[in-house]
From Swiss-Prot:
This is UPF0301 protein MAB_4928c. Pfam families: DUF179. InterPro entries: AlgH-like. NCBIfam families: PRK00228.2-1 (NF001269), PRK00228.2-4 (NF001272). Belongs to the UPF0301 (AlgH) family. The lineage of its organism: Bacteria, Bacillati, Actinomycetota, Actinomycetes, Mycobacteriales. PANTHER family: UNCHARACTERIZED PROTEIN YQGE, UPF0301 PROTEIN YQGE.
Length: 208
């Protein structure tokens, strides 16, 4: 069973939460870890899907800041990095590789712009070999990730069907959300009932 933004009669999120059809799994959407996903790497994680195609799925975890400053790794990009200006852990794959997302300014076009590749809406991938001065006028900010999360063909669909993930729409601000905010709860709170009730699920399950 897959999930989206609107509940549909006859399917459920976990225990009693209604779920819509599967076709919304695509680049630019969010994967929200369900409350039954206890694996430390992904517990209460919010993953932005960068690519979803016949080759599989690639995404980055938006709410796992590291203690490594962007300036210490990519000093030329530090000025554009959103607060906190640290590297984020995008996932368990290729932790020694950097991947960068940007939130575009409203109304800008990046057609023909070297160094930016549109993902969805106002979200774009940034080529870290590009010149930051060329990118700066077009973006509200960037987020740099160490590593990523990846799934082979059909693997993610299976995990969604197993209720490990809830698939929801992303807002441009999600990519740059400050680490001090609970992005997992924030995304759930903006959903319609009954899904928004999951935002009250305690971080420490022993308190439930």
């Amino acid at each position: 069973m897959a999930h989206g933004d609107e509940p549909e009669e006859g399917e459920a999120y976990g225990e009693g939460y209604m779920a819509p059809p599967a076709h919304r799994l695509r680049a630019g959407t969010l994967l929200i870890a369900n409350t039954n996903l206890f694996e430390p790497t992904f517990r209460r994680s919010v993953i932005f899907i960068v690519e979803h195609n016949d080759g599989g799925t690639l995404g980055v975890v938006l709410n796992r800041p590291s203690e490594t400053a962007v300036y210490n790794v990519l000093p030329q990009w530090a000025k554009l990095a959103g607060k906190p200006k640290t590297m984020f852990v995008g996932g368990p794959v290729k932790r020694d590789a950097a991947l960068c997302l940007a939130t575009l300014r409203a109304g800008v076009s990046i057609d023909g712009v070297k160094g930016l590749r549109h993902v969805a809406g106002r979200m774009a991938m940034v080529d870290l070999d590009a010149e930051p001065e060329d990118i700066a006028p077009l973006v509200e900010g960037i987020r740099v990730f160490a590593g990523y999360s990846g799934w082979t063909i059909g693997q993610l669909e299976g995990e969604v069907e197993r209720d490990d993930w809830i698939v929801l729409s992303a807002l441009p601000s999600d990519v740059l959300t400050d680490a001090s905010e609970d992005l997992w709860a924030k995304v759930l709170r903006r959903q319609p009932l009954p899904l928004s009730l999951l935002a009250t699920h305690p971080i420490d399950v022993s308190r439930n």
